[in-house]
């Protein structure tokens, strides 16, 4: 579309999306977003301040409008240029080869598990140790009762002190 044939008033009535559609149609190749914005500003005669004020809405409109497609790397084109199968291929990012890490030596030898024959004597010693550990735990639990008895005595002492305090308060109130 030749914009020279339009008067400045007619150009001001054109939306930015209409201008981009005709610019991309004339170019017939994908263009970066920044280049599109510069061309719109040139065609419509917009100042940099006006462009900055409208750029967010323009980008939103460009994304929403079904006639345009983002081809990655901030390049835009017309959807009609690309068959559906080709669109998927262009949008997908190219896989980057992964860098191989150097294997660091941890200073340990790799241990290969083998079936080892265990003696029955080793197993019974471990069981004896487990029984002794269990006996220690049970003894410790018996000692916990002593701690509870101490807490009960502390509660009793506190209750007696509280009772004495209450009686002292009552006597002071009676004196007044």
Swiss-Prot record:
Binding partners and assembly: RNAP is composed of a core of 2 alpha, a beta and a beta' subunits. The core is associated with a delta subunit and one of several sigma factors.
Molecular function, one GO term: DNA-directed RNA polymerase activity
Gene Ontology CC entries for this record: DNA-directed RNA polymerase complex
Stretches the record annotates as Disordered: 90-176
KW Transferase (keyword) present: yes
Disulfide bonds listed in the record: none
Organism (species): Bacillus thuringiensis subsp. konkukian (strain 97-27)
Any Pfam family the entry gives: HARE-HTH
One of the GO biological process terms: regulation of DNA-templated transcription
Sequence similarity: Belongs to the RpoE family.
Biological role: Participates in both the initiation and recycling phases of transcription. In the presence of the delta subunit, RNAP displays an increased specificity of transcription, a decreased affinity for nucleic acids, and an increased efficiency of RNA synthesis because of enhanced recycling.
The protein, known as: Probable DNA-directed RNA polymerase subunit delta
Record field: compositional bias (Acidic residues): 106-176
């Amino acid at each position: 579309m030749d914009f020279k044939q339009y008067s400045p008033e007619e150009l001001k009535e054109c939306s930015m999306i209409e201008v981009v559609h005709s610019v991309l149609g004339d170019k017939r190749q994908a263009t970066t977003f920044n280049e599109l914005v510069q061309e719109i500003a040139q065609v419509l005669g917009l100042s940099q301040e006006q462009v900055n004020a409208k750029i967010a809405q323009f980008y939103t409109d460009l994304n929403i409008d079904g006639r345009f497609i983002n081809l990655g790397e901030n390049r835009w084109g017309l959807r009609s240029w690309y068959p559906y199968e080709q669109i998927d291929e262009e949008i997908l990012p190219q896989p980057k080869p992964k860098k191989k890490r150097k294997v660091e030596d941890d200073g340990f030898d790799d241990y290969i598990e083998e079936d080892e024959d265990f003696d029955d004597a080793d197993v019974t010693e471990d069981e004896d140790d487990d029984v002794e550990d269990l006996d220690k735990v049970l003894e410790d639990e018996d000692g916990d009762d002593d701690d509870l008895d101490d807490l009960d005595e502390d509660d009793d002492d506190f209750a007696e002190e509280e009772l004495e305090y209450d009686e002292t308060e009552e006597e002071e109130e009676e004196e007044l």
